[in-house]
Amino acid sequence: MNINRELIGKFYDELDERSKETLDASVKKAVEAKKRGGKIAVVTGSGPNLHEGVTTLVAELISKGIVDGVTTSSAVINHEMGGVLDRVKMCGAAQLGFDEKIMPRGNVFEFTDMTDEQLDELGKEMLLDRELLAKRHNAEGHFVTKAAANMAYPMGLRTEMLAEEIHSLCRQCGLPFEQVAGWGCDKRTMLGAGAENNVPVLVTIPQLVGGGHVGMAVGDSIPVAERSRRIASMLRDSDVIIESAVALTQEIHDGPFETYTGHGIWSWWQKEPVYSLREKTLMRFDLDENLRKAQDLQKNSAMIQEAISKGLPKTKISKIPFRMEMSAFARHEGSLPVIGDIGMIWPVFALKVADELGITLDFMSYKQETEDGKAMREWIVENVRPLDRNKMLEKFSKWKGKVSNA
């Protein structure tokens, strides 16, 4: 994939001056960390990260040794198992004979756009409703590119069924759902790249809800305490933490094993392993300007820390909608808020870091509204494949063999 450097340069130019400054500082910190052998962790949310191609770009950065750990949501796990993005046909459910009472809002039923050959291959794995599938050609509707699997038949159902099978494998081996699923995922997904390169990819506890049965299977695959410890270990080992359009970051800013902004003092008290965000660099790529406002309030008047010290409500004092995690981010000396569209910020950041490290990237994301962004999304639809169940089972068998012979 050729990289459109001119477009990425325009993305940078369109950022406001303060975001340019913090983005440049973020690049510098990331490059410095990697050059001294440090690690970078990425904390992603759902929707925008998928649609802007960010999760696929992060997978590329994992493969090239730039990103060393990822936390994400169950919804992203679901979509990566389905191939990240899908083309689906959205049809009125009534014409297919479905009861509107059980249909999603809008009374719409979705079909995954698949060839007959692809369906025949899938039919070896699961029972398909051939009568329903035959109706997809003549049913009135329109095609749209959406997050893969999810609500479209048959791939949405297939992913939910796979989740139950993967959960069973996890019960046998004691590994997280994400690792086992990653064995069968495309290497151009975060799950697949993580499994291939021994890089942890884990769902945070606040983001376990999502992706239907996938979320439940992820949550049940290992105990909550173990999940929290694994994530704490990832963050402990990271010099740079990048938050990308993520709503819930309590795991980072209010975690049970983090001592600087979280509840880690009590874990330390009880002789459990802990870590500190004190010397780390925190970046956040986000559209929410309140994040920067909260940081300004803290820097200019120490208002946020003062409110905490006096036990006063931060929202009333700051006069802005105050999410819990804003508090720690705003007060952290090494925090860098980059305010803007992640579809613009990530390409600039990734390319600048890769150039500084002398690394050539084979994939690049772009803001989805641009022509390059549209082409990127089409490329993902055509090239990033759904989870390969046979490959996953084969790697599971090899893992069991290694454990048995150890």
Positions of the model-derived regions?
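N-terminal glycine-rich anion-binding loop in soluble enzyme alpha/beta folds
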Residues: 1-24
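Metabolite-binding pocket within alpha/beta catalytic cores that recognizes anionic/polar moieties
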Residues: 5-8, 24-142, 340, 383, ...
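C-terminal functional extensions of proteins
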Residues: 18-21, 228-240, 246-250, 254-406
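Glycine-rich phosphate/diphosphate-binding loops that line cofactor/substrate pockets in enzymes
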Residues: 25-41, 163-168, 194-196, 233-238
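Gly/Ser/Thr-rich loops at beta-strand to alpha-helix junctions
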Residues: 45-55, 75-79, 180-184, 207-211, ...
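Short, solvent-exposed amphipathic alpha-helical segments in soluble enzyme
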Residues: 57-63, 218-221, 256-265
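Ligand-binding beta-strand-loop-alpha-helix segment within the catalytic cores
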Residues: 94-207
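Active-site rim loops that border cofactor/substrate pockets in soluble metabolic enzymes
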Residues: 200-239, 243
